[in-house]
Amino acid sequence: SQSVNQGFDYAEVAEIIQKIKKYDSFLDDEYGENALEMRNKIDEIEDLVQKEENPSRIKALLNDIKNLSIGVTGSLIASGIVTLLSRV
């Protein structure tokens, strides 16, 4: 599948998701009602990265997480997530 998805860095995405997951216990406080949506998107990304498939769906999910994080004001965790995702 390397040639099919050339140019998509699954390892980098996996690393970013691991970093985001370290803050899981803070998601409820920081994201409120969007915490569950965040977790669902993180789980779906993890699944796709593990299978190394559907990079366009992964990018869309990462963008959703970024947008959810941008909507959280005054949160160091959310702004850190936005910064992490700007690398992808």
Stretch-by-stretch model annotation:
Residues 1-72, 84-88:
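Short amphipathic alpha-helical segments that predominantly mediate membrane engagement
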